Amino acid sequence: MLYRAAAHTRQVPVLVDHRVLEGGSDLTVMEYLRPVSVAEGAAFHRSIAGREPAVAALAAHIDTVHARGAREQPWWGPLDDNPANVLRGADGRLVVADLFFADGPALYATVRDDPDRIVRDYPEHLRRHMTELPLGSSGGWPDGDAERMRHGLAAADRRLRG
């Protein structure tokens, strides 16, 4: 949504294709982008956070999309200000990508502790790959944890179906 809404700013990647895949995954194809230095990425994020004139339109689009995500998605996370999310297009311009994410630690704690809530909030067809995603900030899953979560969700699905 952000890439389409903010395309006119040229501060987001050019979206070549986007498809919602079976099982709750998405495939996003965008223009080729190159990494920038950590300092340059952090500076771009600071300019967005400060609503500097050069990025004010982009910041407004980010706010709109982020607010919608928070309304529509349980366990919506804060904006990701990782400097690695700032990249450079072939034409030299800076773009920001991958700003939105789920609050993984809270989400997966709920999967473990209250799988019935997850089953109510996320239909089965949208969470097929839920336990296949890594937790970027905390590494991989402890041995057997993903399997225990899958079993807990399957049992909650059976309870919901009656």
Features from the language model and the residues they span:
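Short N-terminal edge-element motif at the start of the domain
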Residues: 1-5
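N-terminal cationic-hydrophobic initiation segments that often serve targeting/anchoring roles
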Residues: 6-7, 70
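C-lobe/activation-segment region of protein kinase-like
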Residues: 50-79, 89-162
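Conserved protein-kinase catalytic-loop position immediately C-terminal to the HRD catalytic Asp
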Residues: 84-85
